[in-house]
Amino acid sequence: MGSSSSTQHHFAFQNAEKAFKAAALIQRWYRRYMARLEMRRRCTWNIFQSIEYAGQQDQVKLHEFFSYLVDHFTPSSHHERDFLNRMFTEERFAQDVETEEGGDFESIEVPDSYTGPRLSFPLLPDHATALVEAFRLRQQLHARYVLNLLYETRKHLAQLPNINRVSTCYSEEVTVCGDLHGQLDDLIFIFYKNGLPSPERAYVFNGDFVDRGKDSVEVLMVLFAFMLVYPKEFHLNRGNHEDHLVNLRYGFTKEVMHKYKIHGKKILRTLQDVFCWLPLATLVDEKVLVLHGGVSDKTDLELLAKLDRHKIVSTMRCKTRKESENREEQKRKDNQTSSGQKPTPWFLPQSRSLPSSPFHLGSGFKAYKAGRSCSIPCGSPNSKELSRRGQVRRSVDLELEQCRQQAGFLGIREKGESLPLAPDADCVADGGGVLEPTPEEWKQVVDILWSDPAAQEGCKANAVRGGGCYFGPDVTERLMEKYKLQLLIRSHECKPEGYEFCHNRKVLTIFSASNYYEVGSNRGAYVKLGPALTPHIVQYQANKATHRLTMRQRISRVEESALRALRQKLFAHSSDLLVEFRKRDPDESGVITLSDWATAVESVLHLGLPWRMLRPQLVNSSADNVLEYRSWLDSLAKEQLSRENIQSSLLEKLYRNRSNLETIFRIIDSDHSGFISLDEFRQTWKLFSSHMSIDITDDGICDLARSIDFNKDGHIDINEFLEAFRLVEQSCLEGHASACLQSTDTAESGHSSPGPC
């Protein structure tokens, strides 16, 4: 019996040992599997974010390019000055505001056939609820009600302080929501899950209501309606996308003009004014600060509370003060003119190398950008520097004016008539006054709308976005101590889980647009604050399709979308990549190492991605650890050409520049009609030709416009604009090929070649 019992124990021990080993093996496999999935998820996330931030940098560069042109162009008439003002500031004349406030929307008739929601003011809770239901059923609000709602919203916002105060004493809880970006499904889901706004349920929406999503108009209308119904319980903060210049690139302007073709211009003009009146931050129980982006080491809540926020029309363009002319500087400029030299602003080199296009910026533009009085990064000039620049600028304007008069281009101005200033000098205020935000005020607003937290100590310029700052834990700690705060809630950044704590849990990022990059890419979230101010976070996925996917399926789907976008980015820079590959192939063997491939790709795209980890998804495996780069570039071209029947080199240009071209089109289309008129084309061409030494008559400009107007309807639409760009690129490529062939023939005949093609 004893022997039998010991044998049974021995076998039981062996079985248990095998079971433990099997469990450990399964656990190890599972952990490896989950680690690989997490690595894929993080790489995918980095791809999406890098491409998004690269687009923001392109927006800043494009705007700087147009600012460069406008800042060095003196209009020859009030008509030209008004056009340039509309390009960037959409000047709000007092008489327009008075007309709108006087009920201009009442002249818009609502037809009997209209079946959408109807509004009457003052709004009641049932009106706002009906609006949500109508939008859920994909009904559209009539332009009359849109304008009426916007006018009432503007009147309400104008009465609010820059920093709203919310107390949990009057509401059971305060719900803070982050970016929505035109995703109506997320807004409806929040109301469904958390409840509609009420006196017991306060809401704070933390900016970025518009752009990127397809329902930005509907999101705005719902938010504005509930704010009017519950003015004490429903609060809105301004985000960096509540900006008409940002809207030109990211879709909101296009959406408004598509949905409201007749009254879209008036709606956009009113929205620009409404955005300027949005409060900048919200304080909950004086302990929790809610703002869109973040803070900097210079953030001053007292200054933010008392500045005139309506002056900040756009955070993309700082408006400097007008200064009196400097006589000594004027005398020096006059001497230059008498000697036949063209006046050059002080911050440009005397050779004045001008940018030929917003896609290839020259040294002159770089010097200009380095010397601009107000650019988006952290630093800002002092008052003496601004004064000197204003004086130089005025002297240049005077000097150019004299040149025009001497050349007979302008009639003698009437006595007392002032010289026109460049459009960034001022913005016309109600009553004819001048709105002049100081650089310090402008920087305060830029910092709270554009900044991001960082793990490193200190505060530095946010070069990734092109605006605001990176602020470290020490900056957060000093702000908390100074204003006796316990939590900073911000948005502005998409997070995989919809939220993220940092800086010792004193900074909370909330992002409410789920599936932001792709279906399944991220969750949305909102945070609830009770009297104890303990954050309670709720996560969600507004798209039901993601609920049926496994984690592996969801990551694979998002990864495929990210890699497709990355391959498009690589194809758009094929020419630059080929140049870099050749530098690393001195023997012209046609192959480079995979390590050189990764280095070359990063040097061209500057996306900061882990290219060696992404290599298996982008490059076919090679036993020799080398890559035939020409065949790889050809494979990228074939993938894109399968979707577009266009020559590879031309398609590359369109892929690279389409967003910039569409933004340029909307900038030139200053009245938001969806077309470039002959007058808009003429004024823009004068702007370019004046700085590129191109002599062309008005008849020549008209002929050029007619050549672009392919369907001869009297104006240029976006398709004609892009087609003209394609044809110009094609002719340039054909001319380049012809020049190469000619230089080759010359070299073969024994003569020296003028240089490489």
From Swiss-Prot:
Binding residues for Mn(2+) 2: 208, 240, 292, 492
Family, similarity comment: Belongs to the PPP phosphatase family.
Record-listed Mn(2+) 1 binding positions: 179, 181, 208
SMART domains from the UniProt entry: EFh (SM00054), PP2Ac (SM00156)
GO molecular function, one term: mitogen-activated protein kinase kinase kinase binding
SUPFAM superfamilies, per database record: EF-hand (SSF47473), Metallo-dependent phosphatases (SSF56300)
Active-site residues per Swiss-Prot or TrEMBL entry: 241
Binding site for Ca(2+) 1: 585, 587, 589, 596
Domain EF-hand as annotated: residue spans: 572-607, 656-691, 696-731
Chain sites annotated for binding Ca(2+) 3: 709, 711, 713, 715, 720
Residues in IQ domain copies: 21-46
Region (Disordered): 318-349
Cofactors demanded by this protein: Mn(2+)
The protein's Enzyme Commission number: 3.1.3.16
InterPro entries per record: Calcineurin-like_PHP_ApaH (IPR004843), EF-hand-dom_pair (IPR011992), EF_Hand_1_Ca_BS (IPR018247), EF_hand_dom (IPR002048), Metallo-depent_PP-like (IPR029052), PPP_dom (IPR013235), PPP_phosphatase (IPR051134), Ser/Thr-Pase_EF-hand_contain (IPR012008)
Residues where Ca(2+) 2 binds: 669, 671, 673, 680
Matches recorded under PANTHER family: SERINE/THREONINE-PROTEIN PHOSPHATASE 5-RELATED, SERINE_THREONINE-PROTEIN PHOSPHATASE WITH EF-HANDS 2
Gene designation: Ppef2
Protein keywords: Calcium, Hydrolase, Manganese, Metal-binding, Protein phosphatase, Repeat, Sensory transduction, Vision
Domain of life according to the entry: Eukaryota
Region (Catalytic): 128-544
Catalytic activity, as annotated: O-phospho-L-seryl-[protein] + H2O = L-seryl-[protein] + phosphate; O-phospho-L-threonyl-[protein] + H2O = L-threonyl-[protein] + phosphate
Protein name: Serine/threonine-protein phosphatase with EF-hands 2
Record GO biological process: cellular response to hydrogen peroxide; detection of stimulus involved in sensory perception; negative regulation of apoptotic signaling pathway; negative regulation of MAPK cascade; visual perception
Sequence ranges of Basic and acidic residues compositional bias: 321-335
Function of the molecule: May play a role in phototransduction. May dephosphorylate photoactivated rhodopsin. May function as a calcium sensing regulator of ionic currents, energy production or synaptic transmission.
Enzyme class at the top of the EC tree: hydrolase
